Amino acid sequence: MSGGVSLWIERWMLSTNAKDIGNLYLIFALFSGLLGTAFSVLIRMELSGPSVQYIADNQLYNSIITAHALLMIFFMVMPALIGGFGNFLLPLLVGGPDMAFPRLNNISFWLLPPSLILLVFSACIEGGAGTGWTIYPPLSGVQSHSGPSVDLAIFALHLSGVSSLLGAMNFITTIMNMRTPSIRLHKLALFGWAVIITAVLLLLSLPVLAGAITMLLTDRNFNTSFFETAGGGDPILFQHLFWFFGHPEVYILIIPAFGIISTTISAYSNKSVFGYIGMVYAMMSIGILGFIVWSHHMYTVGLDVDTRAYFTAATLIIAVPTGIKIFSWLATCYGGSIRLTPSMLFALGFVFMFTIGGLSGVVLANASLDIAFHDTYYVVAHFHYVLSMGAVFAMFSGWYFWIPKMLGLNYNMTLSKVQFWILFIGVNVTFFPQHFLGLQGMPRRISDYPDAFAGWNLISSFGSIISVVAAWLFLYIVYLQLVEGEYAGRFPWLNPQFYTDTLQALLNRSYPSLEWALSSPPKPHAFVSLPLQSNILRSLF
């Protein structure tokens, strides 16, 4: 027994294998996502009617919002899209045996559970951190939050930030130094490009967040005055520092999703991606522009009119590379032999709802309009269409695309399609009415509202219950896959009549990337020797 336990500990807790670490990230993200979903349901239940429903304390309500946001951003989307899919797939995409720094990879993951524990403690101690995920002073200052909850949230962010920085360095080194000579950068799979760009954004933006929250920590505990007006500080400085990180952060969340969607749409349209180079440069442009538009979150703080004009124009320019990506996905589908598998359904759902989220983003980019919409439910609807329906749908698309390769087991196709439709209906019923609430002026982060808003709020809360049903159905699908799933061959997503489980299929078909040349699941060291240029690799590109 002790031998079995020690082997288990060595396999999972001391692992240096990128595939096992990727699986750990996905399991961790699944757990955090369920926890964050539970918090979101509490929010929607409180808002299902006017006046007090379940949560009498407004501080508790705001603490739930903070916990929900931080859980979903730092402990669900980032670990899943970057840590999970990135770790598992990147060595396979570049033809390498593992990540460049395997032990660094291990510590990158194991910093996250302590960080999650700190965040949960933060929510449970002295009423929690009722600051929202933005942690603006003076609300997060020592006068408004005198207990340790904000300090614990800051420590949680520090730990998850260090984890992300170490992971980003590992990804960049792996892609630059461990590619097989046959795969030059302009032939790298789009998901590989997405990971590179995301890693660079992390390296450039996270230190700024670390600086801002460290200054806040010293303001709270060591009597400094970075953000204390009484001591000559400026709380607006915190907003500038936070959003210089915060806006690239939203692209850190969505760019890996772009890579996944490009891969799945290409595979299930039976065509190579339309405009590969354009797609790469569009992602690069989005990443660069993301650093010079941060003050569009701050139109209401009293910016100079010329400053507001600049940030409006710069923000609207981001719509250009985003539009290139949307139309390239549509062009990839056009004329293709489309198969509506669960993965493809989620990809098409992503394109549809990301477009809606992008259109409301164009509205909010205008300083004159954002003065009215700032801190209303219009903003909540906008970023949930991009995240709750963008990043999350991309995660499901990637899951259903690669999980037969990862586990070597097939899943129930029918139930997976049912899950897509339940989730699609649920999230739209939840978030589309919030556009109307925002247009009517309902403010965010307040647990009570006038009776006039009751109708749309009730519909929105009903939609959240539908979404929870989809989440439980997903867990059941995973359970069935693990318990009853049939063996998945090397190419689990091909039509059975069109493939044989041999490398001959690679010679006859254009493949998106190298992982399909391997067994399902891949061996711990997938490519012991680097794959050489051959007919197979020529057929890939």
UniProtKB/Swiss-Prot annotation:
Cofactor: heme; Cu cation
E.C. code: 7.1.1.9
Positions that bind heme a3: H382
Pathway: Energy metabolism; oxidative phosphorylation
Record's catalysed reaction(s): 4 Fe(II)-[cytochrome c] + O2 + 8 H(+)(in) = 4 Fe(III)-[cytochrome c] + 2 H2O + 4 H(+)(out)
UniProt key word Magnesium: yes
Keyword set includes Membrane: yes
InterPro entries: Cyt_c_oxase-like_su1_dom, Cyt_c_oxase-like_su1_sf, Cyt_C_Oxase_1, Cyt_c_Oxase_su1_BS, Cyt_c_oxase_su1_dom
The protein, known as: Cytochrome c oxidase subunit 1
Gene this protein is translated from: COI
